[in-house]
């Protein structure tokens, strides 16, 4: 069976790998699996997209596929991924679909599905869609005549989502000057409206999409652009979103980057003090910084680690009924309010904490000391054998003894490439780089492609 779904939906180069033909089939078969086979004759489906030039092409094909199976489609236009997830639940739709490749460059695009509960698909649901794609089954329902349903536009959905985000905080942001970076993507209009409605004074970059400039030297993957603006414009802080609005990276008033670990710590600390943190637990991935875990320990907050990927964070949060989790990359999940990472929601919550505490962002982050981190990738013949390689395990043990508790080692196979990733955190940059290179040399010697 072909594998279409990755860790975050179906992705590829638009019109080459992710073609209109494939988008049509994803609409048809995805609509059947996730809505039509629930017994609904005309399942209600919401469709949103980011600002990529290929979005309208794929949107048209996807909607045609959905209508061909009998779906009633509401087109949301340009909106964030978490906006689609929220509206799918709020409007009691049977299915939500987002067309986006998130932080990827403009040639890429993707299609991801949300169930009626607002959560991404299970592995079983993805496999069922893939099975139908392989079969290309001609026997699925094909409504005709009066059974074919019109699609409609519901661009007001974005304002409904903004109104909801405003309702999640009890303070306005009057007197605060905030720099916003929309990555020329889904939040380009949403972010200025949201923070403007909350009475903040805003300075914006990355909010002029033209279909071709999404994520181009702006957004959460290029926070240095916003850092410069924050300092030059004397802002209180800055918020950088990614192309589809499910990530947030912040900038403090001094121009320092504040990553997902630091944001989780600040929000988790506030929630814990207000007795709002379920089981006093934060869910993160194995890539979170050692300083994050030490800071949580100092606050008496527990932590739980998952594999890399926000879907694994969400799975663990649902399993344990936890309400805060996320990744260093800026995917922050606040389960009390939404079912997926939400950059705008996270930004509003962070701004609210800054306003209520009266502390600057640099003061709030100072309570978490980040350990310098070094990452080395090694191309290998069989990445999955790294955990059983005796020489690699021995050098890891030796380095751990030398670090004496002031560091951390993570050696793991890449999820997408024939690589072993060696990550070391240590007390200094020099130590982190030296230890990472030492381990990587052994991985290369014993497992590398050249050997």
UniProtKB/Swiss-Prot annotation:
Residue sites binding Mg(2+) per the record: 102, 242, 244, 246
Keyword match Transferase: no
SUPFAM superfamilies: Phosphoglucomutase, C-terminal domain, Phosphoglucomutase, first 3 domains
Enzyme type, top EC level: isomerase
Catalytic activity: alpha-D-glucosamine 1-phosphate = D-glucosamine 6-phosphate
GO molecular function: magnesium ion binding; phosphoglucosamine mutase activity; phosphomannomutase activity
Protein name (record): Phosphoglucosamine mutase
